[in-house]
Amino acid sequence: MSTDEPKTDAQWRAELSPEQYRILREQGTERAFTGEYWDHHANGEYRCAACGAPLFSSSAKFDSGTGWPSFYEALNAQAVRERTDTTHGMVRTEALCSRCNSHLGHVFPDGPPPTGLRYCINSASLSFHPKD
């Protein structure tokens, strides 16, 4: 199968852990303060756990006090796409991997300078790659 063809649900289920599948493919959310990266401070790059696309730099990570990894900007303008999420009786901005369309988390307008944004991302949506 070409890398340009979308994966089937069965392929995603085979490749992802049940928790990753629930979050990445079913728009789930992990409980606060339980994910691997909420208190992670190493220098490197955070990538999509589903497809490996580079998403965030550790230099943009900050402690938001929310219990989820938080970033004030994506790695670049093409890394993360946004769409309106009206689930759970709220209107929010969902963050998705631009490459594979997997759910990452949400974007809120309460972050620090220079952007004022807070990308609130599920740890299960990420893999970390240390800087060499």
Swiss-Prot record:
InterPro entries: Met_Sox_Rdtase_MsrB, Met_Sox_Rdtase_MsrB_dom, Mss4-like_sf. Zn(2+) binds at C48, C51, C97, C100. The active site is at C120. The gene is msrB. The lineage of its organism: Bacteria, Pseudomonadati, Pseudomonadota, Betaproteobacteria, Nitrosomonadales. PROSITE patterns: MSRB. The keyword Transport does not apply. It catalyses: L-methionyl-[protein] + [thioredoxin]-disulfide + H2O = L-methionyl-(R)-S-oxide-[protein] + [thioredoxin]-dithiol. Residues 9-131 form the MsrB domain. GO terms for biological process: protein repair; response to oxidative stress. GO terms for molecular function: peptide-methionine (R)-S-oxide reductase activity; zinc ion binding. Its cofactor is Zn(2+). Keywords: Metal-binding, Oxidoreductase, Zinc. Belongs to the MsrB Met sulfoxide reductase family. This is Peptide methionine sulfoxide reductase MsrB. It comes from Thiobacillus denitrificans (strain ATCC 25259 / T1).
